[in-house]
């Protein structure tokens, strides 16, 4: 896997995770002043004696690489960076929580909800997945705490429903 790395605190050090337009500006800087930056690549399988963490061991990129290949390396790397975390506003969260009461959202319902609250359907899907995992973890943590301390579970929504029918 190829990775840009700073040399003497070059601006390349701030490139990963930035937008593609930012990476294009970096490419222009590299073209104009190639001595300011040096491209490195990961050696993915060095001998164990050379590095305790193989992916952290860097080697200079071969000097035989032409500038067009260099551009492809840089652009490809920037495009593969993960997107920034999306912070939902209160309105979006309230709308998502309202729909949470339904067990399952169809793709169409998810798309409509996403459009209504200004998110992508994928963001809505991931929010529901994350919320389900959070509830599962809270349920598990409450049960572990209750069994360790022999205290009753305080969360009413996690308690099993008991029938209170009077005959």
From Swiss-Prot:
The keyword NADP does not apply. GO terms for molecular function: DNA-binding transcription factor activity, RNA polymerase II-specific; RNA polymerase II cis-regulatory region sequence-specific DNA binding. The keyword Nucleotide-binding does not apply. SUPFAM superfamilies: Homeodomain-like. It is found in: Nucleus. Keywords: Developmental protein, DNA-binding, Homeobox, Nucleus. Residues 80-139 bind DNA. InterPro entries: HD, HD_metazoa, Homeobox_CS, Homeobox_NK-like, Homeodomain-like_sf, HTH_motif. Pfam families: Homeodomain. GO terms for biological process: cell differentiation. SMART domains: HOX. One of its GO terms (cellular component) is nucleus. PANTHER family: HOMEOBOX PROTEIN NKX. Belongs to the NK-2 homeobox family. This is Homeobox protein EgHBX3. It comes from Echinococcus granulosus (Hydatid tapeworm).
């Amino acid at each position: 896997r190829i990775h840009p790395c700073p040399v003497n605190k070059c601006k390349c050090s701030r490139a990963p995770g930035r937008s593609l337009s930012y990476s294009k500006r970096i490419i222009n800087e590299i073209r104009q002043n190639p001595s300011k930056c040096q491209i490195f690549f990961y050696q993915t399988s060095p001998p164990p004696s050379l590095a305790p963490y193989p992916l952290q061991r860097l080697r200079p990129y071969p000097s035989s690489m032409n500038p067009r290949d260099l551009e492809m390396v840089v652009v490809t790397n920037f495009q593969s960076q993960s997107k920034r975390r999306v912070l939902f506003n209160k309105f979006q969260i309230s709308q998502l929580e309202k729909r949470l009461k339904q067990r399952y959202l169809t793709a169409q319902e998810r798309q409509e909800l996403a459009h209504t609250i200004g998110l992508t359907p994928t963001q809505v899907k991931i929010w529901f997945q994350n919320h389900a995992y959070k509830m599962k973890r809270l349920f598990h943590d409450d049960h572990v705490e209750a069994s360790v301390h022999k205290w009753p579970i305080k969360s009413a929504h996690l308690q099993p429903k008991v029938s209170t029918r009077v005959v």
